[in-house]
């Protein structure tokens, strides 16, 4: 009886190993036939043209968006929050894949700028970009260029070097806000 039990025990282990090999072979075949592109960029670009057109009719300030950036720049995020200070956001990766964002809001600059620039501080310096005087803010994580406007603030911020922030600020174009319907 012990010989029969021993033989059954060995068969059970052998059957388990064979089953595992069959399952692994099936998984390998399935993996081979699933399409994949190892060279594809994992960061998806977003098209912000529809959101921009919508926000330009809804926002109470001239909404800024870049025009003419090099093709290596990639828009990665877009949103508008009409509840939280009419906040407009466009996120980009520059040619070196560093983050640059355009932020606009009617929230007071003293509150808004440190929030979107991850606690950057005003240096007291300014820089003229495309004929406009931008405040220079610097921080541990992000630097920022800040353009105070009438009832709103525009911020170009991110982890990218200052040259990329300046390039974005120079590319920004605005259209006046839509007139309210009467």
Segments the model singles out, each with a brief description of its role:
Residues 1-72:
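Charge-rich, low-complexity N-terminal segments
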Residues 6, 19, 77, 105, ...:
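Generic serine detector
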Residues 17-33, 69, 90-92, 100-102, ...:
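Generic hydrophobic secondary-structure signal
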Residues 31, 35, 123-182:
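A short, solvent-exposed beta-edge/loop patch
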Residues 47-140:
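Short, solvent-exposed recognition patches
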């Amino acid at each position: 009886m012990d010989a029969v039990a021993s033989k059954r025990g060995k068969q059970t282990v052998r059957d388990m190993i064979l089953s595992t090999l069959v399952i692994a072979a099936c998984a390998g075949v399935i993996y081979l036939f699933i399409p994949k592109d190892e060279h594809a960029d994992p960061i998806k670009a977003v098209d912000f043209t529809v959101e921009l057109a919508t926000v330009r009719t809804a926002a109470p300030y001239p909404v800024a968006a870049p025009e003419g950036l090099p093709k290596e720049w990639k828009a990665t995020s877009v949103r508008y929050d009409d509840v939280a200070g009419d906040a407009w956001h466009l996120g980009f990766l520059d040619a070196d894949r560093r983050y640059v964002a355009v932020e606009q809001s009617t929230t007071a600059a003293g509150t808004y700028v440190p929030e979107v620039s991850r606690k950057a501080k005003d240096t007291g310096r300014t820089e003229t970009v495309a004929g406009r005087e931008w405040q220079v803010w610097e921080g541990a994580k992000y630097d920022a260029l800040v353009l105070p406007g009438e009832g709103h603030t525009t911020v170009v911020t991110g982890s990218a070097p200052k040259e990329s922030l300046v390039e974005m600020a120079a590319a920004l174009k605005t259209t006046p806000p839509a007139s309210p319907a009467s």
